[in-house]
Amino acid sequence: MFKLFTARQHDKIWDFDGGIHPPEMKLQSSTVPMRIAPLPDQLIIPLQQHLGPEGELRVRAGEQVLKGQPLTVGRGRTVPVHAPTSGMITAIAPHTTAHPSGLAELCVHITPDGEDRWREQQPWADYRQRDKMALLDRIHQAGIAGLGGAGFPTASKLQGGLNGIITLIINAAECEPYITADDRLMQEHADEVITGIHILRHLLQPQQVLIGIEDNKPEAIAALQRALRGQDDIHLRVVPTKYPSGGAKQLTKILTGKEVPFGKHSSSIGVLMQNVGTVVAIKRAVIDDEPLIERVVTLTGDALSSPGNFWARIGTPVLYLLKLAGFKPQNPPMVIMGGPLMGFTLPSLDVPIVKISNCILAPAETEMGLSEPEQSCIRCGLCVDACPAGLLPQQLYWFSRGEEHEKARNHNLFDCIECGACAYVCPSNIPLVQYYRQEKAEIRALDQESARAAEAKARFEAKQARLAREKLARELRHKQAAVKLTDADQQTVDAAVSRLTRQSDGSESVINIPAGQMPDNSAVIAAREARKAQARARQAEKQQARSTEETTDVVDPRQAAVAAAIARVKAKKAVQAQHVTTDVAEAGSEAMAEDPRKAAVAAAIARVKAKKAAQAQHVTTDVAEAGSEAMAEDPRKVAVAAAIARVKAKKAAQAINPD
């Protein structure tokens, strides 16, 4: 009884809240065998085809490349891209890519040479002989990203699940209308699907492996059952058709009954999920050494005369594929990449196929119906009932329109899987998913700006802290240099301290200097006075020389005689002043020899006399100059000036020698 209950638990299927049942529209492409698209005249390979940064280029324009040769460097979360065929790189330039914005991205343009020559390949016949890190590196260097639409780097996802994965789920639901790429892949390549699952089991070592597939794919179910015959370690679970049962969180709930918490991934509850197309790409990369250079693309819609699924090389222009399926342009033209609910209208038909391009929908004018204008929300609540993520689409709509970013974030906007179920049931024709996508982009932009501001603030604070540390270090070095003394400096300081100590010890005693023991400065004083007298004599000689030069220009003999007399008087006074200074110095020295007090008095008298002599000399010079000016005017005035000069000179001499 317990075993029967356990078996029933293993086969149990749960359900998720919400969801819709739109028309499937799959038969027009699922019943047609897959075709291989020929090589176009030009391949355009975008450098970024995954969720993450683009890789660094390894090639240049004009270079010949081989099929499978890497065009960019794969490092970290950067997934490399490869040449889909052999040929020449004609350009590396921006080109419009498969994105709703229609912005141009950097692409490698390759002109095929028609030979389709492979690079050297190294197949691994037995992958079990390789360690896990080698397998992960092989998958990463093959450029594999999630082919289900998200484009997450597969190797990074697998590496994060090496420990703690309980359940491995293979997503074969393919729930969106019109898309049948995985359906035809399972019908025609079921063995490769199972081999890829075994590789993942070897890597992850999960406790159970589940394949989830909707019940509207009977041919694919039968093909998988044939490939699984005799294998009990992989369980095929057929689930009811309901959109969006192919979502990661929704399929996890259906197969395990576990709900992924808000803001987290399925790996947080021990579940890892891979798409069927990704599993086949892993098998070809590990065993056959084939990088991801092609994928299955569904071409469908009433605007095509021969819809179906094609093996298309990465970089093939969309218009080229549409022509292979018998494209009949509509008015106005409309081509959608992806399904009718989660896809977007292409801005141009020259955009290339990328790794996440699973469907090209070309509807007829009557197929999509008339576009009705957007109306006001009537708060009917149908969007809430249809939301498979358990969100409040109506509130998120108001927050998005009102730019209330924090409220939108707090209401788990980023848990929205953009399935379009809310917009599908909205009676007001409000494009809710477009509002959510725009709001997510604005929040991401604000987060990036905040992160840049935080980084700038951190750099500024780090710089200020560094400058403060350097300042403290400089001050400390200066203090250490000021405190640190050499041996010689220390000896000098010690000697000065000892002298001060000795002086302080005798500072209270009275100093009595007997007569005759005073410092004898008489010689120094006499020498100084002699130098002053010599300087005055030299000045007098210079003035005499100038006077002589001036007298040579005088034409009148009387003026010459007066000038000569004045010069003689100046010379005589200078000599007398020198003799007086010398006598005073000698007298002072004799007096100092007798008594220090007398020496001081004599020195003071000598200074006074020297000062008077200098004043007399200046007076004589002024008189002489005045006389020379007067001589130039009148001889009588010259005679009077000479007499006055003689009187003043006599008085000055008497003042110097009163005795």
Curated annotation (Swiss-Prot):
It is found in: Cell inner membrane. It is a peripheral membrane protein. GO terms for molecular function: 4 iron, 4 sulfur cluster binding; electron transfer activity; metal ion binding. Pfam families: Complex1_51K, Fer4_7, RnfC_N, SLBB. [4Fe-4S] cluster 2 binds at residues 387, 416, 419, 422. It comes from the Bacteria. Residues 366-397, 407-436 form the 4Fe-4S ferredoxin-type domain. Its cofactor is [4Fe-4S] cluster. [4Fe-4S] cluster 1 binds at residues 377, 380, 383, 426. Keywords: 4Fe-4S, Cell inner membrane, Cell membrane, Electron transport, Iron, Iron-sulfur, Membrane, Metal-binding, Repeat, Translocase, Transport. GO terms for biological process: electron transport chain. Its EC number is 7.-.-.-. Binds 2 [4Fe-4S] clusters per subunit. The complex is composed of six subunits: RnfA, RnfB, RnfC, RnfD, RnfE and RnfG. Part of a membrane-bound complex that couples electron transfer with translocation of ions across the membrane. Belongs to the 4Fe4S bacterial-type ferredoxin family. RnfC subfamily. HAMAP family: RsxC_RnfC (MF_00461). This is Ion-translocating oxidoreductase complex subunit C. The lineage of its organism: Bacteria, Pseudomonadati, Pseudomonadota, Gammaproteobacteria, Enterobacterales.
